[in-house]
């Protein structure tokens, strides 16, 4: 199963703030963590839209960020492991290498330890840049990337 990924993080190689994955049929995973000391750009562009997304069905009112919705890294790891269990194998598609790096860091739970996953392959593509409905929101950015990729395929452009 192909899965498109986007992350938000606190500056170049900074701490993960949010992680989103969307599969070919639209099934999604979205979790976010507190960012107590954001860099200026993150404070202005990422935090205001953290936790805002279009819940299914399309057209429903956006959910709003609430402190009770924040996740710890460990809880994100457990939830991600459970989410990935639905697949026999997963091909991760990203538009930026840091998204892959952040995802791989989430897989690691300690020295020599990691969450259980199906077999994973990864691909980074610059041609999937897309403007999402909520820019700098990882879930909406992943949804937009998926939509662009599938539209390119349908049009025979890939």
Regions found by a protein language model. Name each.
Residues 9-11, 98, 144:
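Short, glycine/acidic-enriched loop or turn micro-motifs at the edges of active sites
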Residues 12-14, 101, 147:
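Conserved protein kinase catalytic core
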Residues 76-80, 99, 145:
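Alpha-helical packing segments of well-folded alpha/beta enzyme cores
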Residues 98-117:
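Substrate-recognition/cap helix-loop segment adjacent to the acidic, metal-dependent catalytic center
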């Amino acid at each position: 199963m192909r899965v498109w990924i986007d992350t938000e993080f606190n500056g170049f190689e900074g701490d993960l703030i949010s992680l989103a994955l969307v599969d070919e049929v639209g099934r999604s995973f979205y979790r976010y963590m507190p960012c107590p000391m954001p860099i200026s750009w993150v404070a202005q562009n990422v935090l205001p839209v953290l936790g805002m997304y279009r819940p299914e069905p399309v057209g429903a009112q956006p959910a709003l960020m609430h402190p009770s919705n924040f996740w710890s890294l460990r809880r994100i790891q457990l939830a991600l492991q459970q989410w990935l269990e639905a697949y026999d194998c997963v091909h991760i598609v990203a538009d930026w290498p840091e998204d892959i790096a952040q995802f791989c860091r989430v897989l690691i739970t300690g020295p020599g330890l990691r969450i259980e996953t199906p077999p994973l392959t990864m691909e980074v593509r610059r041609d999937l840049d897309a403007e999402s409905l909520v820019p700098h929101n990882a879930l909406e950015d992943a949804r937009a990337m998926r939509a662009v990729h599938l539209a390119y395929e349908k049009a025979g452009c890939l």
